[in-house]
UniProtKB/Swiss-Prot annotation:
Gene name linked to the record: cysJ
Gene Ontology MF terms in the entry: flavin adenine dinucleotide binding; FMN binding; sulfite reductase (NADPH) activity
Record EC number: 1.8.1.2
Region annotated Disordered, chain positions: 217-242
Flavodoxin-like domain ranges (all copies): 60-198
Keywords in alphabetical order: Amino-acid biosynthesis, Cysteine biosynthesis, Electron transport, FAD, Flavoprotein, FMN, NADP, Oxidoreductase, Transport
Source species: Thiocapsa roseopersicina
Listed Basic and acidic residues bias regions: 220-242
One GO cellular component, as annotated: cytosol
Protein name in the entry: Sulfite reductase [NADPH] flavoprotein alpha-component
Catalysis performed (reactions): hydrogen sulfide + 3 NADP(+) + 3 H2O = sulfite + 3 NADPH + 4 H(+)
Subunit record text: Alpha(8)-beta(8). The alpha component is a flavoprotein, the beta component is a hemoprotein.
């Protein structure tokens, strides 16, 4: 901006001051102007300020419900774009949001995933339950829009997003955009919805009023080019669309050869600064199809693998698409396999078996803020896992041992056979011997006629479970969706029978403060 432009703007300077500045600054070099700019800011005690309007700036609240981190990432990107456009936007986990304050919000955008059989993510459970309640208040003054993430192959595709969109409208809230449900390959849909939402809000909501007078930025063309080059070269964080290429150090089968499941323990070399993970996080792994299968398909249909095709917004050769981008059994885009840290996934044993030492694979970090160790190191832990769901607890105990945390630990683990499927058995024995594993309850369902499962062990240990919870224990559940539901039912029985609670209030999911209960589905 030049001084002649001040006359056309809202300015604290009258015509006399503008004229005086024009005379004083006439003929100054860029270096002299830069010095004067700093001098004026200094004697003013800080940035030169414009008068602001007394009315409060309207705020946009972006709420996310996320199980594996995808919805959180989309919400954060949306918030960053809103802020760049001058909007007063804040991004909040639904788990950190007080549902009773929903009616006081001015603009709400919801980004939420669905997991299990149409269930809300852990951090969305309380808000989801609150608005579904018959006593939820009216929300006539609340403009909103909902974006859902899910897997279209499931029966209850984006069920949680549908629930939020429907119920908010029933409560009188004003829908400013139609519900958008995004499948696994969601990037283009989320970007389009985000643009539509911000365009809509820009027409409805005022920008944050600036209280700083714009001053000219004095930079040479050379400096500007250098700055632009640095911006382009700035490292982009690794995510689903920009995966990190890791080197495989170890591929070890941790079930016996006669076990039903070929479960693999994979060790990957990751540069220390590439990603910062915590116990409870998962790795998203882009697993490639066997090149020989791709070649067989191409030979069978008589198509040259070098033929160029369009896949979404990208153009690539057909063979490359068959190996890296398409699910060969259905020819829809491949999806990321979510592997718990230090674990194999039973559903991906073929892919894990193909990986050889020193081979490379594409990964990204799928953070899970709902599945974390408690901050207090003396908090007792009850860790319930079935099959490969036991893997996060290996990381939990390693972290507690490294930190010297004294909290008691109880592992409840189930699988098919003791001798074939006791995953990480030597690790648990070492922790037990070192005094870091206070209790171990096991359930192997194929070793005898009894067929016990982890939920049966819970019922048998009901009184002790209550004692640990009364002492402040955090309870974790990791395994298949059906197993998690069975555990929840067992806990309801325990609280009903042992504690005398009403069944409608007995589940840990119904507690107002649910930090003591965390689940992670495989």
């Amino acid at each position: 901006m030049v001084l002649s432009q001040l006359n056309g703007l809202t300015s604290p300077l009258d015509e006399r001051h503008v004229h005086a500045l024009q005379i004083a600054l006439k003929g100054m070099t860029p270096t002299q102007l830069a010095w004067v700019s700093g001098y004026l800011a200094g004697i003013g005690g800080g940035p030169l300020r414009m008068p602001t309007e007394p009315k409060a700036v309207e705020r946009i609240t972006i709420l996310f419900g996320s199980q594996t981190g995808n919805a959180k990432a989309v919400a954060e990107q949306l918030g960053a774009r809103a802020s760049e456009q001058g909007m007063d936007a804040r991004v909040i986990s639904m788990g950190d949001f007080n549902p009773r304050k929903l009616s006081k919000e001015q603009w709400v955008l919801i980004v939420v995933s669905t997991h299990g059989e149409g269930e809300p993510p852990e951090n969305a459970y309380a808000l989801h339950a609150f608005i579904q309640d018959q006593g939820a208040g009216r929300l006539e003054q609340l403009p909103f829009a909902v974006l859902g993430l899910g897997d279209s192959s499931y029966e209850h595709f984006c069920r949680t997003a549908v629930d939020f969109d429907r119920r908010l409208a029933e409560l009188g809230a004003q829908r400013i955009l139609p519900l958008q449900c995004c499948a696994l390959d969601y990037r283009s849909d989320t970007e389009r919805w985000s643009s539509d939402a911000l365009n809509r809000l820009s027409a409805l909501a005022p920008r944050k009023a600036s209280n700083v007078v714009a001053m000219p930025t004095l930079r040479s063309h050379q400096d500007l080019r250098s700055h632009q080059e640095q911006s382009r070269n700035r490292a982009r964080p690794y995510d689903k669309d920009n995966p990190y290429t890791a080197t495989l150090l170890e591929n070890r089968r941790i079930t016996t050869l006669d076990a039903v499941s070929d479960v693999r323990h994979l060790a990957l070399a990751i540069e220390p600064d590439a990603m910062h993970y915590r116990p409870g996080d998962a790795l998203g792994v882009w697993v490639e199809n066997d090149p020989s299968l791709a070649d067989t398909i191409l030979a069978g249909v008589g198509i040259d693998g070098a033929a160029r095709i369009e896949l979404g917004d990208e153009e690539l050769d057909l063979r490359h698409a068959l190996i890296e981008r398409l699910e060969l059994t259905q020819l829809h885009p491949t999806t990321v396999r979510g592997w718990s840290r230090a674990s194999g996934r039973t559903g991906a044993e073929d892919a894990g078996e193909r990986l050889e030492r020193e081979e490379q694979t594409r990964i990204y970090l799928a953070g899970n803020d709902a599945f974390r160790l408690p901050d207090a190191g003396d908090t007792p832990l009850i860790m319930i896992g079935a099959g490969t769901g036991v893997a996060p607890y290996r990381a939990f105990l390693q972290q507690r041992a490294a930190n010297g945390h004294p909290g008691r630990n109880w592992l409840i683990f189930g699988n098919r056979h003791f001798h074939r499927d006791f995953l990480y058995q030597l690790d648990w024995q070492a922790h037990r011997k070192a005094g870091r594993l206070d209790r171990v309850s096991l359930a192997f369902s194929r070793d005898g006629a009894e067929k016990p499962y982890v939920q049966q062990r819970l019922r048998e240990e009901g009184k002790e479970i209550l004692r640990w919870l009364d002492a402040g224990a955090h309870l974790y559940v990791c395994g298949a969706t059906a197993m998690g539901q069975a555990v929840d039912h067992a806990l309801v029985e325990i609280f009903t029978i042992e504690a005398g609670l009403d069944p409608d209030c007995a589940s840990l999911r119904r507690y107002p403060a649910r930090e003591c209960y965390a689940t992670d589905d495989l």
